[in-house]
């Protein structure tokens, strides 16, 4: 067994982490037979040409683990924890075994929360962030930026209201500072034993806003609805690719006999579903968010109550004046403004045919491009 305090391995790792922060990377990967690598703008970039050996990967892992963590890793082949670099950042660490060898993934947890205006978020979200009660769910796949957008909304609320905001996360993604609000951040496994205990005790802590890091099951969804029903603003994230898919996933959390009541509760308490994807900027200048917004309204509430999820998208298209926007409408705007290429717009569309037709018929940018634009 390697010495858990091996200085050489730790110093080398810290240098890679600082390099990743310098170039605004999101993740660092340590795995056997591949050089250390970081992910920047969704793409893997190698930090050296020399592949890491299995022994080196284990040495790096043990250099940052406590004795208790080494014991846990040795018995389960898994360990989750966090480390900090002085004057740099915190990192969430997942240590695992793959093909019999140690591997690690480091996720940067930053205290520098992007301002609302820098994220290309629809202005209606500022209004949503200041609502008194209800349920706001951010939707997206892994790496879609939903946690960053949600953190930005919490920060906006922090600056523009005088509340107690409680976040329950696994792990904490962004470090919030107290501004006009008191921010209480609780990490599962560190500040509280588990999700059920944390959620059960939340209302005893006099919150105004409750952030649930991720809704993964029926019990957590029940708590989210309960928080909204009792007069709190509950914000959460959910893994899904669109608002329609998110609604379907929530419905499928529950057995058939509970679904009618669930749909009624959602129709009464939902404020918004916000779904986003990160699209490469044209010219390789990073990525930009395409954001879909579903707001509750009498018509939307009626569709949800009836379980007519398939009709919601069409109603969103007709409700842009309220602040609603579909993914394809967001992609059209990004293309028209010169933020993304035609190819990336079509590739990410929910309906490539409809978006292609919309660009052909309405887009001034496409008309100006003339025959140079290949309308595939």
Where are these regions (language model features)?
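Short, flexible helix-loop junctions that flank or precede catalytic/ligand sites
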Residues: 1-376
